[in-house]
From Swiss-Prot:
Gene that encodes it: thiG
Family label: Belongs to the ThiG family.
Active site: K99
Organism whose genome encodes this protein: Sulfurimonas denitrificans (strain ATCC 33889 / DSM 1251)
Stored Pfam families: ThiG
EC nos: 2.8.1.10
Record-given protein name: Thiazole synthase
Subcellular location(s) of the protein: Cytoplasm
GO MF terms held by the record: thiazole synthase activity
Length: 259
């Protein structure tokens, strides 16, 4: 099924985006990413190692693959920090596709500070960045981010790394209805069925890291996520049947043997 995910000027053949944290080494990160079929991997700017070419670099590990890098501003708590981070990153790498995240609660929930995120988005969009904005599952804030110049909205399903799955499915639907941008469900995905559910709700894609990296068999989970996202997307596009309170016979009664 040819169904490209378009984010700004970029087109991706896979609707699954993966993270790069929590793996034992860069090689395992690469193997799991390739098993997932993802064409986009998000990585904290500090792990891109843009200041010391003599240290191990994740980008070198992925040379020769079709995987693109999505730098993120993990650890930033103000708009100014995120803006500076991405300016330096683009200057060093030429990468303009970014995952903007400004964290409001760094101790317990890792929930985003959406007000600071909007401030950063307004400035970075004017500077030509292609912005995928991590946010809460609030449809009003999603619309504000669209107005601020975001190219994709990334609402959380649940707290980062929690594995709780989609806690507010109606909010994901409301966000999908509120914006005319790709909606990528981000954070809280725990297993393949969570990813499929997100896609069935109408999400344009899913981002997951911990569910793969923390699985007992990361390679198998990566492949499961690949198929789950495809299946969920196909299910959504197919159009599910209406829910009814009573049974509906699937076989006609005409022609039955008369007793």
């Amino acid at each position: 099924m040819q169904n490209l995910l378009k984010i700004g000027k970029y087109e991706l053949g896979s609707r699954l985006i993966v993270g790069s944290g929590k793996y034992k080494d860069f090689q395992t990160t690469k193997e799991a990413t390739l098993a997932s079929g993802s064409e986009l991997i998000t990585v904290a700017v500090r792990r891109l190692n843009i200041t010391d070419p003599n240290k191990e670099n994740l980008r070198d590990t992925f040379k020769g693959t079709n995987v693109k890098f999505l730098p993120n501003s993990a650890g930033c708590v103000t708009a100014e920090e995120a803006i500076t981070t991405f300016r330096l990153t683009r200057e060093a790498t030429g990468i303009d596709l970014i995952k903007l995240e400004v964290i409001g609660d760094t101790q317990k929930t890792l929930y985003p500070d959406v007000i600071e995120t909007i401030k950063a988005c307004q400035i970075l969009s004017k500077e030509g960045f292609i912005i995928m904005a991590y946010t809460s599952d609030d449809p009003i804030m999603a619309k504000r981010l669209e107005d601020a110049g975001a190219h994709a909205i990334m609402p959380l399903a649940a707290p980062i790394g929690s594995g709780l799955g989609i806690q507010n499915p109606y909010n994901i639907v409301f966000i999908r209805e509120a914006v005319n941008l790709p909606v990528i469900v981000d954070a809280g995905i725990g297993c393949a069925s969570d990813a499929a559910y997100a896609m069935e709700l109408g999400a344009d894609g899913v981002l997951t890291n911990t569910a793969i990296a923390g699985a007992q068999n990361p390679m198998m989970m990566a492949e499961a996520m690949k198929h789950a996202v495809i299946a969920g997307r196909m299910s959504y596009l197919s159009g599910r049947i209406q829910k009814r309170p009573y049974a509906t016979a699937s076989s006609p009664i005409n022609g039955m043997i008369q007793f």
